[in-house]
UniProtKB/Swiss-Prot annotation:
Coiled coil: none annotated. Residues 17-110 form a propeptide. The gene is Cpa1. It comes from the Eukaryota. Carboxypeptidase that catalyzes the release of a C-terminal amino acid, but has little or no action with -Asp, -Glu, -Arg, -Lys or -Pro. Disulfide bonds join 248-271. This is Carboxypeptidase A1.
């Protein structure tokens, strides 16, 4: 094992990729608040370099954490000493990354049309942006591309607009990939874009939606982070901005919105995966959406898509006070989840962010809801932790297909219940 580790580290140095040989993902089961607090203490020990995939929220909710090889025994000993049970969900993270790379390398042929594009594999930013351009070229009467800004590192932030005409019509916003390592979301976003062009004029529900509203789809919401996951660190979550006074890079773009910014549910530590940034909208990736939504002024539904955990969430994240539209949002979430489950039997839970998972301040949909966008939802796609952020490419299309049924339900309701 030691020889393998040395070889892997040398290869990583040559190719620039961070190595995860021997890293394990543990599922921790905290049975009471005291055990949850112990895990939180573990989380604060930065020298352990733990990467929490599912945070310690409250007793009874699973906690998933990636543990580097050098600290795995210390972490297990800590848990065992405090009688906190755990199981190994992923034995070796690098082996899954190697499988992922091998699968991607087998499908590297450049598509000359969106029909030839491979929707059952993961793609780079350049490939996704080329796909977007192809889609616009093939469907100029339905699809256009808008650049709403540029990233910290200077990449374009592109959004697809699906419209049957008119100006400033009521609209629906969908974004995927705000957390860069959640690859199944960007892949699903690509599939959604193609699905819209295939179904308009053929499928009555989508046709009625687009005859009444525009759809904006941002497939890669965090381009810098996404490129970094491909070139350097597959597990990168945040943006790539620099924080003055810290060597740690990036901000959690789902804690950077001007909705209870700085309250519990986000971190002030620049090295944390949930670092909120120095001020609201500090990240250009967030500010670009804020400016677009504000200037548009007629967005009626806002749907932000993440992975993993199989959840459909609505406001609030920062307070347990029920949202004014909680009853309607809850019923709509139930209908959307029912539609999703009907295809492949995938089970989703639904509810407000704070009641269903944890307290989160500065989140996307708390801000959009505060701007009067009633139908504000966050999805957490497959799975529930068996593979986590490393979902096999074979699950991309089934994930996108079932999620689309939930999206259709929300969009159809939005059209039929104007406000």
């Amino acid at each position: 094992m030691k020889r393998l580790l040395v070889l892997s580290v040398l290869l990583a140095a040559v190719f620039g990729n961070e190595n995860f040989v021997g890293h394990q993902v543990l599922r921790i089961s905290a049975t009471d608040e005291a055990q949850v607090q112990k895990v939180r203490e573990l989380e604060e020990l930065e020298h352990l370099k733990l990467d929490f995939w599912r945070d310690p929220a409250r007793a009874g909710l699973p906690i998933d954490v990636r543990v580097p090889f050098p600290t795995i025994q210390s972490v297990k000993a800590f848990l065992e000493y405090h009688d906190i049970s755990y199981e190994i969900m992923i034995e070796d993270v690098q082996s899954l990354l190697d499988e992922e790379k091998q699968q991607m390398s087998a499908f590297q042929a450049r598509a000359l049309s969106t029909d030839a594009f491979n929707y059952a594999t993961y793609h780079t930013l350049d490939e996704i942006y080329e796909f977007m351009d192809l889609l616009v070229t093939e469907h100029p009467q339905l699809v256009s591309k808008i650049q709403i800004g540029s990233t910290f590192e200077g990449r374009p932030i592109n959004v697809l607009k699906f419209s049957t005409g008119g100006t400033n019509r009521p609209a629906i916003w969908i974004d995927t990939g705000i957390h860069s390592r959640e690859w199944v979301t960007q892949a699903s976003g690509v599939w959604f874009a193609k699905k819209i062009t295939k179904d308009y004029g053929q499928e009555p529900t989508l046709t009625a939606i687009l005859d009444n509203m525009d759809i904006f789809l941002e497939i890669v919401t965090n381009p810098d982070g996404f490129v970094y996951t491909h070139k350097t660190n597959r597990m990168w979550r945040k943006t790539r901005s620099h924080t003055e006074g810290s060597l740690c890079v990036g901000v959690d773009p789902n804690r950077n919105w001007d909705a209870a910014f700085g309250m519990p549910g986000a971190s002030s530590n620049p090295c944390s995966e949930t670092y909120r940034g120095k001020f609201p909208n500090s990240e250009v990736e967030v500010k670009s959406i804020v400016d677009f939504v504000t200037s548009h002024g007629n967005i009626k539904a806002f749907i932000s898509i993440h992975s993993y955990s199989q959840l459909l969430l609505y406001p609030y994240g920062y307070t347990s006070e029920p949202a004014p539209d909680k009853e309607e949002l809850d019923q709509l979430a139930k209908s959307a989840v029912t539609a999703l489950t009907s295809l492949h039997g995938t089970k989703f839970k639904y509810g407000s962010i704070i009641d269903t998972i944890y307290q989160a301040s500065g989140s996307t949909i708390d801000w959009t809801y505060s701007q009067g966008i009633k139908y504000s939802f966050t999805f957490e796609l497959r799975d529930t932790g068996l593979r986590g952020f490393l979902l096999p490419a074979s699950q991309i299309i089934p994930t996108a297909e079932e999620t689309w049924l939930a999206l259709l339900t929300i969009m159809d309701h939005t059209v039929k219940h104007p406000y």
